[in-house]
Amino acid sequence: GLTIPSVTAQAELMRAVLTLSGLDPDDVDFIEAHGTGTPVGDPVEAASIGTVYGTGRQQPIPISSVKANFGHLEPASGMAGLITAILSLKKADLPPMPLDFTPNPHIDFQKLNIVCAAAGMSLRDADVHTAGVNSFGFGGVNAHLIVQTLKQPVTDRDQTAQILPPLLLSARSDAALRDLAASYADYWESAEPSYYEMAYTAA
């Protein structure tokens, strides 16, 4: 049967995930909300986010939901939210929602200390950015995860491995293989790419 969302259950899960991550609520830059789009679901989710991430925070925590742009997607909605959160972290920017988007009037954003990033927004200037992602289901699925950027990107100079990974190339003939190897050599000399990234892509 269908289940009714619970502020308590959602908030308990968020706190548990924060504890496992070793993070404080203030460490999280934004929440990619599930965004059920229902009169009951959205206020419950907003209340749980405000309870955990909004309480005691100096600035309201931004919330967004990519599903406002193209619908719910049913079983794939969680993956859409995760992908959006990762891209938002990479670009340090939250995407805008549709121009006609209107926040749920039953949500007291000021009291919960949350803000709807409907117009899009840039993340605060920091070495590390962190996002929380919600995903719920009709059958009672209650999921919350935290994703975070790396403090420093890994470069060739940072690599400590003494053995380089193989550069795997394949072709249908010896001549084609030689041509492919030559093209990689030309690319290596002209673009100066990361060998590790090139080997990973080729594999």
Model-inferred region functions:
Residues 183-187:
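Conserved short hydrophobic interaction patches
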